[in-house]
Amino acid sequence: MTNYGAIPTSSHPSPAIDLEYISRAKHRIKSGLATRRPWKSMFDFESMTLPHGFFDAISRIKTNLGYFRANYAIGVLFILFLSLLYHPTSLIVLSILVVFWIFLYFLRDEPLVVFGYQIDDRTVLIGLSVLTVVMLLLTHATSNILGSLLTAAVLVLIHAAVRRSDNLFLDEEAAAVTEASGLMSYPSS
């Protein structure tokens, strides 16, 4: 029996839902990259001085890690990428794992449902972490990856300790208040 003139029903999700998911992912990636600070500001050599002491170094590290968080993440990923160029299998496996992390953990708004069961974020985090460790062990590039991550961490900590943080503003309101108070202050006699 045929149904002429009937509107066909589709068994796959509509393209509008797919486009919505892609645009939401694009928005999250853009908002994450929007926190990136200018590289010129990060590597301003006039702002590089040795800290006065241990607590000054700790204070600088905390401030700079918060301020340059996206820049440091890009730098760490770049160092990791460079270290995996000589291990193409590991690079492919790591790329697949990054896609899993992005879509199953970072870009997911609603809870993950598998076979009708709702899985919480902690379970997804543990599962992805175990999968990542197992895959890194299977590719025999674990020492290379750990070495590159250790190198990147040391470089980030050195930069964060040496980069002065007194001229950084975590939000635009603080910058405006400081500029206004600087313009309105009068020298005391």
From Swiss-Prot:
Q: How does it sit in the membrane?
A: Multi-pass membrane protein
Q: What happens when the gene is disrupted?
A: No visible phenotype.
Q: Which GO terms of type biological process are on file?
A: vesicle-mediated transport
This protein's GO cellular component annotations are: endoplasmic reticulum; endosome membrane; Golgi apparatus; plant-type vacuole; vacuolar membrane
Which top-level group of life is the source organism from? Answer: Eukaryota
Q: Which UniProt keywords apply?
A: Endosome, Membrane, Transmembrane, Transmembrane helix, Transport, Vacuole
Where does this protein reside within or beyond the cell?
A: Endosome membrane; Vacuole membrane
Q: What is this protein called?
A: PRA1 family protein F2
